[in-house]
Amino acid sequence: MKTYLLFFFLLIGSGVLNFLSAQQITRYQVIKSFPIASSGGWDYIAVGPQNNRLYVSHGTQVNVLDETTGDSVGVIPNTTGVHGIAFVPSLGKGYTSNGRINTVSVFDLKTNQVLGQIAAGQNPDAIMYDEFSKLIITCNGRSSDLSLIDPVTEKVVATIPVGGKPETAVSDGMGKLYVNIEDKSEIAEVDINSRSVTNRWTLSPSEGPTGLAMDVKTRRLFAGCDKTLVIMDANNGKIIDRVTIGDGCDGVAFDPELKYVFASCGEGKLSIVHEENADKFVLAADVPTKRSARTIAEDPRTHTAFLPAAEFEKTAAPGERRPPMVPGTFQVLVVGQ
């Protein structure tokens, strides 16, 4: 018995158990898929607030699915060029960023009925709700700024220039926003009270930051760049680590209980990185998904991830940059253990 105990404690001291926790316990795989019959492109997907709903941006509408069965439970229409979805549960409202018409749609979380439209900046992309400031924030790609919207009055209360194309924003819950500036390969720190950029931190030599998530306890930022997940200290912009991931990452999610960082990569891979501690990160798994599955939402209650994807033709039509999507192939992949 003493020999076995000694070996066990040696394992702990050598860090082998941490390695096993990342490499063996992570058994994520695609467990099912939810087909969506309608046509059109897509961007972000969101898990609803305690209502067992998935909200899938899809061309000119948002498809609302039952998170467990994948059954359609509604459609939010007239969201042309929709990118993202955010929620304010206390008001019973949801919000979509409509990139092609420069608006934010307001909808009822119970009925999915559109309640109104709010003018935003140019090409609003990612959208989020900041619990600290009680504001909706949109990242406006073409006007290179953030729109801050009061969800009670449904008015834009401030616009913050960020000096580049803002792709995604996260909040530390204490008055700071962190924004991926895609065309500058940097993260901008924004003070929500002063309505200004207070720091700019380079991600170089990593390029093209898109997805962004944060561990608010360890104050680590996770930026999905070209084939690299960059881990940054949110206190000072110091690069903590760079972990190789798949190609074409456009979404990052973080599970605060399991300490997993999920990076969805369009090449057909979900890279999962384990946060051993604030300064140590290891690649736990590269889960095969489907080519085009580049964005992600993760439900921290069930530890399940959801990735929209579709099949595409092999060649592009004359004058087009990309091959067309094969009709009837749009779906949401469900990844779990």
What residues fall within each predicted segment?
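Positively charged n-region of N-terminal signal peptides that target proteins for export
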Residues: 1-5
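Cleavable N-terminal export/targeting peptides
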Residues: 6-7, 16
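Predominantly soluble domains enriched in secretory-pathway, periplasmic, or organellar proteins
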Residues: 10-11, 18-337
